[in-house]
Amino acid sequence: MSKCGRKKYMKTNLRQMTMETIDSQQDGSLPDSVAESESAHMQTQTGQNSIPTLAQVSVAGSSTGRGSPAVTLVQLPSGQTVHVQGVIQTPQPSVIQSPQIQTVQVATIAETDESAESEGVIDSHKRREILSRRPSYRKILNELSSDVPGVPKIEEEKSEEEGTPPNIAAMAVPTSIYQTSTGQYIAIAQGGTIQISNPGSDGVQGLQALTMTNSGAPPPGATIVQYAAQSADGTQQFFVPGSQVVVQDEETELAPSHMAAATGDMPTYQIRAPTTALPQGVVMAASPGSLHSPQQLAEEATRKRELRLMKNREAAKECRRRKKEYVKCLESRVAVLEVQNKKLIEELETLKDICSPKTD
């Protein structure tokens, strides 16, 4: 075998030996010591600069610890022992320690549809409770009128669950029923019929119909209502929906007097002395809103038109007067300027006469 072939063979065997040693240490099968047979071909340096023989010897490989470089003990044929260190070294553990990073996880809890629905239901219940606690206008009116004498109280309208009052029968009657201070019930139907019932009567069955008649000399648009029942003292107070009404009969006269807390559509009526004589049991109710007949409406429109025209005429007259005053002022100013102009012309002629002889 030539020298080149020997060198290549030795290098190849040395690489294989070193790789096997490193693999055995990395696997960790022998943590304390590793004993194995390895074949090593060493080249001894002599004065002739050549490799005399190729020896195969048994060596003992030891490792000081895991991760340290592998050191192989090689015994030559001449009896000399050589320590051979592996070329490939395992990576050393880093001395620098990485800082410990504390990981914090933030979890967001989203509201589900059920929670949103439950909140909506709670809000609706609260709103209903607030609305149910609000007193009705009738309750407020009764509280305000409790200290005022002669003002009747209106019964609260009970809900459907509580049922109808015991003294009013449950029947479909398209009327508005009111209770007076004397206990009587006044029902006003849609057609304009007014009915009165006594306190002892059972519901609306005891209502008395009031006949609608016309008087000989009532005011235009007035309504004549006949009733049959009055209180013991001759006074009666009741509420009637609508505008202000004047009521008269043979003995008494009813005039509207609004309370401070009244809503405007529920005027109170008080009794006064009569001014005219009407048939017995007949009252005259005249509403100012019903007095506007077509003729009166036309007269009102004509009156407004005449008033507007009169204001326009007065404004035009004032405008003409101011224009005349302005023209007179301008005329007087022109007259003054003309007089001044004449004086200046005369002075100019005089100056010319004075200057002309000197030039000659």
From Swiss-Prot:
Segment Disordered: which positions?
A: 19-52
- In which broad location class does this protein mainly occur, judging by the first location in its UniProt entry? nucleus
| Function comment | Transcriptional regulator that binds the cAMP response element (CRE), a sequence present in many viral and cellular promoters. Isoforms are either transcriptional activators or repressors. Isoform 1 and isoform 2 are transcriptional activators. Plays a role in spermatogenesis and is involved in spermatid maturation.
Keywords from UniProt, A to Z, are:
Activator, DNA-binding, Nucleus, Phosphoprotein, Repressor, Transcription, Transcription regulation
Please list the coiled coil stretches.
none
Encoding gene (name) = CREM
Post-translation: what modifications?
Stimulated by phosphorylation. Phosphorylated on Ser-118 by TSSK4 in vitro.
Q: Which superkingdom, per the lineage?
A: Eukaryota
* Region listing for Leucine-zipper, in residue ranges: 330-351
Per the record, residues carrying Phosphoserine are S118, S145, S287, S290, S293
What is said about its interaction partners and assembly? Binds DNA as a dimer. Interacts with FHL5. Interacts with CDC34. May interact with TSSK4.
List the protein's name: cAMP-responsive element modulator
